[in-house]
Structures are given as structure tokens and as C-alpha cells.
Amino acid sequence: MNRRNFMKASGVLALGALTSCQVVKDDKKPEREVYELQIHTLSENGMLLKDYLRDSFIPAMNRLGARVGVFSSFKNDEDNRLWILTVYEDMCHYKKCKDGIWEDEVYRSSAQGFFDKTSTGSASQATEIYLMESISPDYRFIAPGADRTLKEIRIYRSPNEEGHKRKVEMFRDDEAQIFTDTDMGVAFYGKVLSGPITPTIIYMPSFADEEIRDAKWKEFGPKYSPIKNLEKYRNNMERVVSNDYVRSLPFSHF
């Protein structure tokens, strides 16, 4: 393909993507929210990342209409991971923010110091990124109350795509309602579109303290058992990839 035809084809693809976003907005149909979870294992320059998030990234995302939560380990001071959860209205909003942040001169100016300082020594030893969409347009992000200081980030893996589909349906049609009835304070349910481990689903319950957490999970168990054993939901989960207890940092949106 010559350059002219390539550019023409690229333009058509770009226009198609833009048009699809416009159609979504024009039709005013509810879209699934999109979530991005980054898990950073901090290096000795880790404080630079926290400063960048507080002073540059979060204000820029706020100007673009996105919400950002930043979390560290709830109790383990030796755990040097940092969790960053960004909430977008839909996939079009996600794309708008990813592109728009680089057009924000305030952000570019504010963040340049971070980019300069980490150009020869990253703030993270490793980074995992999960891109998700809500399990249903009906399930929207609910920011945990300020009193819910203990949060869990739970990642479940299914054995295959068919099992994953049934696990998502289980959450959407039955399990999420049990969480609501048990007052587990779940902020979001995310079906993973891409990430280091798939097929997976991620969700975040929240509690006032560990004692309440234990009591709520104990209450949840008997309500969950009847649906867990339904034929349509059998063998839809392989393992718990991780279950991390986290707390919000002072500059986190939630």
C-alpha cells in the first residue's frame, strides 16, 4: 500500500472511531464505564510518582472529567506497591483523556520535572495495567464513603473464556445483588479487557475496619452458597489471583 492510500485508510479508520463515539453520545444510550487499574512496584524513586500523581496527573484527569483513586497497602509497610484506579465515563471518554492530557499545557509544564527526573531511573520497578469495562451499564462506580477506610482489590481468574463469560453473568445477575444486600460497599465490578492475567474480573469491596470486614464476609457466605452450586455457574472460576487490602492516600479522589 502506498503512502497516499495508507493515509486515506488511516483517516477512514480514525473517522470511524470518532463517528462511533459521536453516535454513542448522540443516541444517549447508557454505556459501560471503563476502569484502568495500574499496580506499581515502587523503586527507590517511588516518592516521585506519588508527587506526580498528586500535583500533575490527578488535577489533569479532573479537568478532563475522570476520577482517580490512589492506594497503598492497608497495614503492611514493607509492601512497596501503589494501586492507581482511574474511572472513565465510557470507552470514548477513556480515549479522550489518554489523548487530551498531552494537549493540557498546565499538565505538561507541571509533569515535566517528573519526566526529567525519572528518565534515567524509573519510579517503578514493575507496572501491571488492567483495562476493564463495567459488567453492565447498570453498574456504575460508587465511591466508598470516607468511613470505609479498608478496601479490597480482588482479582479472580476463570479457566477459559466461556467460564469467564459465565462468571461475569454470575456477578451481573446474582452475586452483585448479594454484595449490595450484605452492604459490602463494592465500588465497581470490572470485566478485564486486557491485562497481564486474563480472563479475569476485578472488584473492590470496602469496609470501616477489619472486624466489620470479617463479619460481612461471614454474612455473605450462606447467601452465596445456593447460587455458587447452580449448574449454569459451575467451574466458572479457576483461582483468586490476588486479594489485596489497601487504603486511600490523602490526595486520592476516593
Q: Predicted regions span which residues?
A:
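Extracellular/periplasmic catalytic domains that process cell-envelope and extracellular macromolecules
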Residues: 76-78, 121-124, 145-149, 195-197, ...
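An amphipathic, aromatic/His-enriched active-site/gating alpha helix that lines ligand/cofactor pockets
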Residues: 7-13, 29-32, 47, 51-69, ...
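Short, well-ordered beta-strand segments in beta-rich or mixed alpha/beta enzyme
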Residues: 35-41, 69-102, 150-158, 190-192, ...
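C-terminal segment of N-terminal export signals and the immediately downstream linker at the start
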Residues: 21-39
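N-terminal export signals
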Residues: 5-24
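Surface-exposed interaction/gating patches
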Residues: 134-208
